[in-house]
Amino acid sequence: METVIMITYWDLISHSEMFSDSYMSQEIADGLRLEVEGKIVSRTEGNIFDSLIGGNASAEGPEGKGTESTVITGVDSVMNHHLQETSFTKEAYNKCIKDYMKSIKGKLEEQRPKRVKPFMTGAAEQIKHILANFKNYQKT
């Protein structure tokens, strides 16, 4: 029997699961940033029929009718890892990323002090790149 190992990437600050190695990703700027490929997908949620519900269906409501279904469209890697898309303006993103970078800097000072200066320099360049291309990112 072959053992399969899946690598899961976690956020250092929030400890949220971000994505797994089942998605194509690439390191940018010596690992300062990861880009993860995702596809826009649509999924139907809901649509549970009486035959799948235990108990007395006639006492629960009209017989033979399923619950309402909803079609949800989004990026597969976001939906599969239960992440929430944001709808930042450029200004709101800039404020949020500055606060986040302060948190990252604090973690690095605790755990890898020699990494602080190169990380902060490289991250500033990457943030400039993201802000310059902000219009190209999906906003819901």
UniProtKB/Swiss-Prot annotation:
Top-rank lineage group of the source organism = Eukaryota
Question: GO molecular function: any one?
Answer: calcium ion binding
| Gene Ontology cellular-component terms listed | cytoplasm
Q: Which Pfam family would be a valid example here? A: TCTP
Q: Domain TCTP, which positions?
A: 6-140
InterPro entries from the UniProt entry? Mss4-like_sf, Mss4/transl-control_tumour, TCTP, Translation_control_tumour_CS, Translational_control_tumour_p
Regarding protein family, the annotation reads:
Belongs to the TCTP family.
Q: What is the name attached to this protein's record? A: TPT1-like protein
Species annotation: Homo sapiens
